[in-house]
């Protein structure tokens, strides 16, 4: 098997290229290193490589955050000989938190890791008259969470309020602008929610925002999306539940049943007359209609042993 390390030199506000390259050179494997040139470059590179080497077994190492991992997965999806794993060095690194206690920071462990089959979300959406397709590995968010992603983009690389604090900073900024989000929401062809929502999320992973356990019951290989919606609430009530939202305990609180809804499904649509933002693995898309289909076990993802 060939091993290709795809490094985002801007991930996490620090260039890890040399550290990773030095460790890779000590490994007795056939390996290459590719430094990304900008947004979506990882997807382009992986797609091109798989197209040019259709019979080759290859493992791609996404060296960056969840956005870099998403780009690598988007390029590898559908190519039979391709596997993916992650060396997490971004600002979030949430997808790999699914495997609690597993260390993804050792190159040797990643190279020797067995691959498991995981689900991937296929997302079709309209950007104006044009239908576009992309993929999500970890989470998709509507409403408040997407507004948080927008705010995060503004502060991600700023000192003190950026980096690992970016998600918390985004929450504070969005409290005053992103608490009422109208939409029509269907699950497996049936109307689930219509009207104002604080937020809605669809997940195969469990964590987002640098450690918020927003989908504690999710499984990434069962073919089902973990779907949660929360109705608009006051800032005071929001402040009273944010701790349990971060720890994942909010789904167990009976006093939140009037505002929290939860279900599982394979296919979701979200629509509104006016364009809105959706967060996909921490990145933003804009449209007025999104269709999400969970593709069961379509990606081989390497997970180191504990």
Where are the regions a protein language model picked out?
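Phosphate- and divalent-cation-binding pockets in alpha/beta enzyme and binding domains
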Residues: 44, 71-72, 94-95, 147, ...
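Short acidic/glycine-rich loop or secondary-structure boundary segments that cap or lie
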Residues: 145-148, 193-195, 207-211, 235-239
